[in-house]
Structures are given as structure tokens and as C-alpha cells.
Amino acid sequence: MIKWPWRTQPPAQQDSYPWPEACAIPLLAALGDDEQQRLIALARQVIRQKRLIPLQELRVTPLMEARIALLFALPVLELGIGWLDGFHEILLYPEPYVLHEEWEDDIGLVHCGPSVQAGQCSAQGPVVLNWLDVRDSFDCSGYNLIIHETAHKLDMRNAGIASGIPPIPLREIAAWEQALHAAMEAIQEEADLLGKEGASMDAYAASEPAECFAVLSEYFFSAPELLSERFPAVYAHFARFYRQDPLQRLYQSGLLTPESF
């Protein structure tokens, strides 16, 4: 088991991670210098406050640790590290893992069998990830396992359950729900028409509101131009909640122009 250093570690220990190399991924390319430095500061807090536990003899390097911490820090860049206080451990498998689970089908029959998982979390439990999918989360494809699980944790701060409604002002809940459910219906309609593989967005978002919030949070940070185009109301709600505007960040950095899409 690897224990990430705690707050009592001297500052020199915090600086032993290769932060410039860790930040050199497409997902973080649009960050300004000030944003990048604040993100690194938050990532250092993640490293101090959480325990990273590699499983199945996975060897974790400082670069891997740093990038994992950066991805946890990104959604709370403007919210603050306190929003991640719902867990203390990160379990890291080498690749997707198998769980034996029970589930109920559409007619009420209960089944039991193996289920392949990319990651998972619960209200007070650890965040479970796998390195293969984390490694695929550094680009701007709309897929990001760490942001997905972090969104669930943020969602669970509202009454301890994942409902698709994180802690937001009461006056905004009705409009939030309306926008989220409209997106779910549109995503399901597209998947029914084109098939899950042909759909422009992950059809898993249509399965339930909690998954819609988590999946669309992945797009918000890693493919904001797609989310803004498909579901502008959802994008606006997410921008207010996360207090970030990744699409504007792309424009300001020059990585995206109005003619790009």
C-alpha cells in the first residue's frame, strides 16, 4: 500500500512530483498560468489528504499520482478542497475489475452474476478507479473516469445520495431537473435511432439522473463545445455550479475558434 504524504510532511516533499510533466495533457492545455498554479496547489492538498492504494501489484509512479490528483482537483478548482471531504481513500486497480452483484430486471426478476466495473464510489466509502481508464482520461474526448466519480461524490453531498442534483440553491432545482431530464430524453432518442455506438454522446447518461450528471460533467470539462452545442441549458447550469467555463477557457487559449465546430 502506498500512503500519500499527509499535511505534516515538509514542503520539500510536496515538490517532489513532476508537476510540469503532469500538467502536459490535452485536458489541461487551456488552463491559464494562474489556473494551473491553483490547480497544482489543490492537487497537492489531494495528495496530502487522501490515501492512494494500488491493488493487484500495480506499481504507481509519482507522475501517475500527480495526474490522478490533478484530475480530482479540476472539478473543485473554484469550489475548494472541502468539497472532496466525502472520501479518504482512492483504490486503484490496473484495469477494469469484476464484481459479483445482484440486479433486478424490468419484470422484477433478481439476477446475480459478474459485472465488469471501470470505477465506483459510495457516500462515505473510497473512490475506486482503474489505471487503464484513468490513462484514457487525459484527452478531450468526453470521457473521464475521475471526473465521473468525483461528480458522484459532489452529488452525494446533497443528502448523502446520488440524485443528479448536487448542492445548489433551492430556487435553481426545478430548472436544473428540467434541463437534465430533457437531456436524458434526447440522448435516449438518439441512442434508439442510431444505436449506442453511433450516438454522439454516451448513452449511459440516459440511464438515470445521477449518471446523467456524472456523464455530462465529463463532457463539461473534456468536450465543452459538444455539451454546449447539444444542451446549452445543462451547460449553463453546470457552469454556475462548478463556477468554471471550460468552453470560454478554450476560446481564450486559442485552442478553439467559432469555426472549429
Curated annotation (Swiss-Prot):
InterPro entries: MetalloPept_cat_dom_sf, MtfA_enterob, MtfA_fam, MtfA_N. It comes from Edwardsiella ictaluri (strain 93-146). This is Mlc titration factor A. GO terms for molecular function: aminopeptidase activity; metallopeptidase activity; zinc ion binding. Belongs to the MtfA family. Interacts with Mlc. GO terms for biological process: proteolysis. One of its GO terms (cellular component) is cytosol.
